[in-house]
């Protein structure tokens, strides 16, 4: 068989595989379309997550890490549950906050005042059916914890919405080898580069992937690398309408095959098939000059494969050539084998779960304006990160990155920090008096009366609202988010 014939056969097989996958996925999407969304603005593969719907309401009334009225009490409880906040401020965790029991909704938008921040230890999602909205996780180096700020691995039906994660010692947010997940409208910023990681300088954005996973409208800012890294055997991944700002020596990379003897437990697949569509890439002061400055992705050869990549519609600020054709210099595999570029490129996207997609330029405006824990209001950290992304300039730096890596102009602050102290540490989050809730069902008395409910009946929040697929409690929580 000659080389041209082999190439045609390989292309035909890839086309047939994509068509078969498309038929299966469209049937799956049609069936799931009959289910209620996690909340009205939920999109992507995690949008049908049930969370704590219809379950018990836990009120967080203290910033202590443990005991009655604590966030930890609610997280460690069993059964369907929704967590609402009657206080704002920063919770200094004494150990990892591990979500081990399924069916939970954490509604950070309910906090009265400036919102909630978790400090000191990571949040680890080790359960299915998890909804987390409007929460900050800013790890820091005080506890010498070598961890991601937020992580999920080996679980299904998870949606993270409007999370602000930063100051991690390992990756900032890592969500991979999962199934049916969405990460949307999050700010993932300022991992700690020269901190206390056992491997030395670290400070990465995250490892992302998951078989049937959606990552959209996120701001990834000021990490040296893994912006993000696609896990080996990431599965079917849809990455669109994100903003990547001020990467250091690498932007997106990874995506090779997973070794068949890999040890990850659930949802393990060998392949990576990814759409990278309509994202906005904006190099910053830390971004290495040369090819890295216009690098969309650096597909990584692993176990004989670089994955399959559909890349289109992305803007690379500063490179008209790459913006006009993302494959003209924007895709830079780490293998020099001549067949690699042809083998990884898909000319049509895999048929992912649709979202309300924007152009890359419109996504930039939306993300910098709305992403992160913006309810009850953005904190000073997110305000600064969004402003830096808009201006293309960073305000702070640590001592390590500039000494180790090439920058276009070392007179500028790199934006890559070693400690949260480099940027002033955790901002104060003030609390205000929460609205009266006589029956402690998560809905204020005045809202219940307005909707014909009884402020003395703790059970009516679990009732399905008239003309809605949601419970009354869910309707209230969504109203806080303008939905």
Regions found by a protein language model. Give the residues of each.
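Extracellular calcium-associated, cysteine-rich motifs in secreted modular proteins
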Residues: 420-483
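Bacterial Sec-dependent N-terminal signal peptides
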Residues: 1-30
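Extracellular beta-rich repeat passengers
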Residues: 233, 238-419
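Acidic Gly/Asp/Thr-rich repetitive segments characteristic of extracellular carbohydrate-active
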Residues: 37-83, 460
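Right-handed parallel beta-helix
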Residues: 92-214
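Structural detector of coil-to-beta-strand junctions
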Residues: 122, 149, 172, 194-195, ...
């Amino acid at each position: 068989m000659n080389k041209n014939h082999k190439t045609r056969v390989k292309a035909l097989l890839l086309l047939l595989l994509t068509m078969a996958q498309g038929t299966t996925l469209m049937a799956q999407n049609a069936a799931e379309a009959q289910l209620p969304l996690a909340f009205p603005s939920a999109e992507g593969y995690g949008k049908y997550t049930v969370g704590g719907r219809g379950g018990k309401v836990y009120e967080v009334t203290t910033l202590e890490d443990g005991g009655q009225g604590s966030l930890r009490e609610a997280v460690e409880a069993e059964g369907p549950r929704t967590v609402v906040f009657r206080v704002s401020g920063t919770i200094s965790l004494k150990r990892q906050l591990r979500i081990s029991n399924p069916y939970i909704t954490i509604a950070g938008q309910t906090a009265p005042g400036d919102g909630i921040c978790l400090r000191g230890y990571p949040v680890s999602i080790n359960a299915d059916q998890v909804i987390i909205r409007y929460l900050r996780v800013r790890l820091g180096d005080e506890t010498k914890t070598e961890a991601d700020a937020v992580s999920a691995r080996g679980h299904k039906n998870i949606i993270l919405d409007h999370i602000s994660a930063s100051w991690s010692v390992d990756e900032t947010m890592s969500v991979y080898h999962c199934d049916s997940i969405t990460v949307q409208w999050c700010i993932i910023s300022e991992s700690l580069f020269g901190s206390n990681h056992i491997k030395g300088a670290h400070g990465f954005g995250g490892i992302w992937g998951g078989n049937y996973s959606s990552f959209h409208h996120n701001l990834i800012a000021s990490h040296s690398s893994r912006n993000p890294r696609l896990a080996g055997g990431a599965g079917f991944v849809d990455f669109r309408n994100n903003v990547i700002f001020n990467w250091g020596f690498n932007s997106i990379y990874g995506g090779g095959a997973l070794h068949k003897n890999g040890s990850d437990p659930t949802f393990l697949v060998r392949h990576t098939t990814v759409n990278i569509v309509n994202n906005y890439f904006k190099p910053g002061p830390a971004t290495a000059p040369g090819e890295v400055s216009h690098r969309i992705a650096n597909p990584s050869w692993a176990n004989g494969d670089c994955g399959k990549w559909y890349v289109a519609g992305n803007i690379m600020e500063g490179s008209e050539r790459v913006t006009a054709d993302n494959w003209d210099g924007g895709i830079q595999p780490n293998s020099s084998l001549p067949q690699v570029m042809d083998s990884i490129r898909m000319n049509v996207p895999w048929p992912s779960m649709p979202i309300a997609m924007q152009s890359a330029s419109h996504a930039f405006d939306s993300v910098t304006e709305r992403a992160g824990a913006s309810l009850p209001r953005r904190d000073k950290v997110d305000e600064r990160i969004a402003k830096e992304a808009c201006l293309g300039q960073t305000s702070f730096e640590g001592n390590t990155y500039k000494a180790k890596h090439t920058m276009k102009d070392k007179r500028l602050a790199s934006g890559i920090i070693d400690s949260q102290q480099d940027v002033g540490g955790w901002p104060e989050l003030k609390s205000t008096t929460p609205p009266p809730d006589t029956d402690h069902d998560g809905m204020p008395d005045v809202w219940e009366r307005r909707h014909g409910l009884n402020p003395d009946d703790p059970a009516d929040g679990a009732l399905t609202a008239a003309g809605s697929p949601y419970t009354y409690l869910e309707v209230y929580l969504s109203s806080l988010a303008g939905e």
